[in-house]
Regions:
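Active-site phosphate-binding strand-loop segment of PLP-dependent enzymes
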Residues: 96-164
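Conserved glycine-rich beta-strand-loop-beta hairpin in the small C-terminal domain of fold type I
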Residues: 231, 246-256, 267-280
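A short helix->loop->beta-strand "cap" motif at the edges of active sites that frequently abuts
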Residues: 67, 88, 147-151, 177-179
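Active-site PLP attachment segment
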Residues: 167, 173-211, 224
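N-terminal small-domain helix-loop-helix segment of the aminotransferase-like
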Residues: 1-50, 57, 234-236, 346-350
Length: 350
């Protein structure tokens, strides 16, 4: 990324095309064809300022006031804001920590459906749950979408982060979804380049893409240099993803083994992303966190995590749960999880 940016030697740093730099668009298309045998054309893609802008544009294009958005709970909390800005509302599909947060059954999907449902959002693999959908579950969702003439927003920013023999798969691999599918992606997680703020939206629905391009034109363009750098990232070989997965799998296993030392804890080993949800034997995870930050030290060290209640739209849900992001080296992850364990003992004894 940085080598490509440093190699830029034009005299003038010009505006890029609103849809995106053509070389970058072509590199994205080549990546999908090489890694997933998916045929995208540059006209099927619009480059955005991170996946967040891709989602904002998508909701602006397809959501009308009063529309309902189905999404499995817990979910990435910014979706609540994206929906509210357009006058839509989140309708959570309930899940359970004991069931590993799985939601893709016909009964569960149909129970959440109403005459106001416009779209279902699938974050796959999931944030904050780390849930990786099986191929069968993806097909169930696809059939549900087509039968009810819904939009499917597939947030696939963590797509390559899958473990235990799971093969990375995109909803774009399901041909019958062609006109119903909107894929959201970014360089942030896949290439550890969050600060580049490069994302994109991809769809074969021409009417939808026309609306997205109009929105892209209204904000001129995405940073030229970041697109130049990102072009090279999408040329990385498959071995890059294999090495990345091997390392994150080790980190996940380290976190899981340490967390499972806690008596009465509920934790399912996640199949993807780099997040792990933990249901602790306490009433209030946020209160526990404040204890760790303000009162607890072990060798002058403590730990911080994300209380999971913020990932729920249903008031009162997730109060005993936390989200761990296993993005540090394994030795740090091991120590952090040990601090949760020992801190929990001190918290319950106070």
């Amino acid at each position: 990324f940085m080598d490509a940016v440093r190699a830029f030697d034009e005299d003038v740093l010009m505006y890029e095309q609103s849809q995106g730099d053509i070389k970058f668009l072509e590199s994205i298309c080549d990546y999908y064809k090489r890694e997933y045998s998916i045929e995208y054309k540059p006209t099927d893609i619009v480059v955005t300022m991170g996946a967040s802008e891709a989602l904002t544009m998508t909701f602006t294009t397809i959501i009308d006031p009063g529309d309902e958005i189905l999404i499995a709970e817990p979910f990435y909390s910014n979706y609540q804001t994206f929906a509210l800005v357009r006058g839509g509302s989140i309708c959570p599909i309930p899940t359970s920590s004991k069931e590993g947060y799985r939601y893709a059954s016909r009964d569960r999907l149909e129970a959440a459906l109403t005459d106001k449902t416009k779209v279902i959002v699938c974050i796959n693999p999931g944030n904050p749950t780390g849930l990786a959908l099986t191929a069968e579950e993806m097909d169930i969702i696809a059939d549900f979408v087509i039968e009810n003439d819904l939009w499917l927003i597939a947030d696939e920013a963590y797509r390559e982060y899958v473990y235990d023999g799971i093969k990375p798969r995109s909803f774009a691999n399901i041909d019958k979804l062609k006109k119903n599918l909107i894929v959201i992606d970014s360089v942030s997680k896949r290439f550890s380049a969050c600060g580049a703020r490069i994302g994109f939206v991809a769809s074969k629905n021409e009417e939808f893409m026309t609306g997205i391009i109009k929105l892209a034109q209204s904000r001129l363009c995405v940073s030229t240099l970041e697109q130049i750098g990102s072009t090279e990232l999408f040329k990385l070989p498959s071995s890059y993803y294999e090495e990345m997965n091997e390392e994150y799998c080790k980190r996940r296993d380290t976190a899981y083994e340490e967390i499972m030392q806690i008596p009465d804890v509920i934790c399912h080993k996640p199949g993807g992303a780099f997040y792990m949800m933990v249901d602790l034997p306490i009433d209030d995870a946020e209160d526990f966190l404040m204890f760790l930050l303000t009162e607890y030290r072990d060798n002058n060290e403590t730990v911080m995590f994300a209380p999971a209640a913020g990932f729920y739209s249903t008031l009162g849900n997730g109060k005993s749960e936390i989200r761990i992001a296993y993005v540090l080296e394994s030795s740090y992850i091991k120590r952090a999880c040990q601090l949760i364990c020992t801190g929990l003992e001190a918290y319950k004894a106070k």
